[in-house]
């Protein structure tokens, strides 16, 4: 299988092309160094389920004392392996699934770190950062804790290489520790430093944190080896934790302003309740003062939520806490005139409202009485008209017309009666004169 790797980086994936062509002739023509397939052809189709893993720091360790170049591979001591990490990736793709990447049974891992069977932990811990998740992180932490408890820690670990502070940059320079390391650092500008991606060291002997190293950006102090391994599963997690710590520090710095703003709001009788939680184990006196201020804010703002009546007494009269100075200034006794004027102003609208309501009520009563009188008058008029006496459903217009006609007829009869009266009176006078003449004769 190692012989199928193409030495030309442009043709490094040509070894995989026969897997996708049905031609058997092309299947065996993989390259000049190609070997015939094994008995089980299907093993060639069993590719790794993950993208190519980043090159480990095992290939970047100190060169041998002889000063020669680093030989990377799984063969014997005299066999030469490609130094380019691109060849490492292609060789990783062509490994059989039963082969161990980071540790082998014969005491040497894939990159010949020479750590023996104790380095099998790395095959569990170091995974690709694209496939990391919370469940995988918990499993890794559990496996790390079990293996750390079962195996004693190594003594006198050398310091690991310094970590590049920015994780967003893809181009990282490999740390150069020897003459053979310069070629690796210059030939692979796009290779990610495993120290940034994996917080777990490839070598167990490099687990401890150096005492004189730089402190992280988040301000955390380095803990023991177990805690450093179980802290996170990728460099992104560490950077996000440091960003969260920076945000928490900014929030802690802004909390004093929040407390002052809440005091101003409480002085203006606004119902505001805040609960600020601070976790700062370094400072001992500052959190205690902060919690006392928060308790005061909660005690002052809680009764304001229950105060619905503006005429009710101030809640500070019943509470044992001393109100702030602004509240004392606001509660200074005012002169009598300003207090009476609002009452008179408030009473005048009330009086005007009451007068308007009484006026409306009286108007409604009078209007109702007028309508009743009008109806009764129409009924009486209808009763006086001889044509409408028995007509209860007569309209008002009909009643008025018939009534006018009846009045005109009555007036004509009156005139006739007056003329008849005058005639009768004149005859009476003639008769009286005749009676007096006969008496005299």
Swiss-Prot record:
Transmembrane segments: none annotated. Residues 238-257 have a biased composition (Acidic residues). The modification Phosphoserine is found at residues 240, 242. Pfam families: HLH (PF00010), Myc_N (PF01056). Keywords: DNA-binding, Nucleus, Phosphoprotein, Proto-oncogene. InterPro entries: bHLH_dom, HLH_DNA-bd_sf, Myc_transcription_factors, Tscrpt_reg_Myc, Tscrpt_reg_Myc_N. GO terms for biological process: regulation of transcription by RNA polymerase II. Efficient DNA binding requires dimerization with another bHLH protein. Binds DNA as a heterodimer with MAX. Residues 358-410 form the bHLH domain. This is N-myc proto-oncogene protein. Its main location: nucleus. The gene is MYCN. Residues 67-78 have a biased composition (Gly residues). GO terms for molecular function: DNA-binding transcription factor activity, RNA polymerase II-specific; protein dimerization activity; RNA polymerase II cis-regulatory region sequence-specific DNA binding. It is found in: Nucleus.
